[in-house]
Amino acid sequence: MATSNANKTKLKILFVVSEMEPFAKVGGLANVIGTLSRRLAGLDCDVRVVLPYYKEVKKNLRNLKLRVKRLDKRISTSIDWLVEEGELYEVKYKDVKVYLIENDKYFGRDQIYATPKGEFEDNDMRFGLLSLGALETAKAINFKPDIIHCHDWQTAFIPICLKWRKHLKDDEFFNNSKIVFTIHNISYQGQFDKVIMDKFGIPGFLFTSQGLELYGKANLLKGAILYSNLVTTVSPTFAEEIKKREYGHGLDAVLKWVSRKSNNLQGILDGIDYELWNPETDKSIYSKFSSKEIASKSTNTLKLKKELGLNESEEFPLLCFVSKLTEQKGLDLLLNSLPQIFDLGYQVVILGSGEAHLEQILRRVNRKFRKNLSIAIKPSEDLERKVYAGSDMLLMPSRFEPCGLSQMIALRYGTIPVVRGTGGLLDTVIDYNQDKKNGNGFIFHEFSKISLLDALIRAISVYEDKKAWAKLITKAMKEDFSWKKSGTKYKEIYQKLLA
């Protein structure tokens, strides 16, 4: 076994990822990897991360002033009968060694996944190089992983190719490695024409409904689910939801099968970095505060409203929406409800970037409702922090939400979440009207204007009771959604796999 003496030696964990904070970030995945890898290192694990050396990474490394070491090693792998190569670099970030694969043909672009016109057409080649290159990197640095932890479809080639690709499936270097695959966003699945299987040396007989085929395409996420030792997702509720047709995005049947097979589907709640998100030390906000001294939160609200050009009266609670601008996040429901939200007495601030047509809609809406609405597209991190600290409430009307980090950050800053009851939102928010002792927010269940407005009516009625609202803020700020519990849980499942 890889670690019959697992209790005596450090667990060797190889993370393979397409983004990681502070090097390259598109969404919440980067936050998770940056924090979870460090948490596991703090739990006496030897954690290594492999990441593409994107243009963005090079820029951020210069800003971070971190020392990057070029290794005297190259990785090469055969894809589509061609040899694709990469230079290897190493950088240490806190207690974690990060290995960067440089290949300007695939990674030297301004964007990570897509342009405004759509995803890069060669994403199969790009992330195939990441996946196979990560395995070659492990061999090049002589790091025999006990656990290879893959994240989202961009790393799905690893479990598929280790199981089926000639030479790799018989490679003794990885004989004792176990594969954990985490689904962060099930709506992105890596769907390609059947020819991709020949490109990557995956046997054609796997193109069936029992293998990689789904709706006439080779589905990489499906393959990863089938051929990993353990599949996890980012909250207990979402792990149950994705086994249903409504949330499974076509993969519900295979997820149900995997779940029945030795409980090989588990939901582990993500966390946030409590050092990074801390209103007591945050240099970006107007006035620092804590759960023991919440008075300064109102100073943040007043100054934020002034900066945004909104009415500074406390009579109007400030409701924020901080999110990627996608249909998943329920932005359309918010926009359709804006006139009624303003009638209730709310002011609204929207921060985000994402789908081009939604950005254009927001610009038009901003011109229409300037008096009560402020919108920032592609906001700075400083403004984002000010909004978390200065808003009274956070709205998350998501169609589905695997985990959600915004509500955890909001709670940390005493900003009360008003959320739709789905996925990780149900694992982190307790409805105040249902449980005044433990409640930390407000939940609505139907994806409808009536249901959303009902939750906002309930929230503003508590807001108007200043004593009750202050207690609610204090309760919210005392919640603990740090990585302490989740990191320990991941280490436990690693050890169980290796036992």
Place the predicted regions along the sequence by residue.
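Catalytic cores of nucleotide-sugar-dependent glycosyltransferases that transfer UDP/GDP/TDP-activated
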Residues: A2-A499
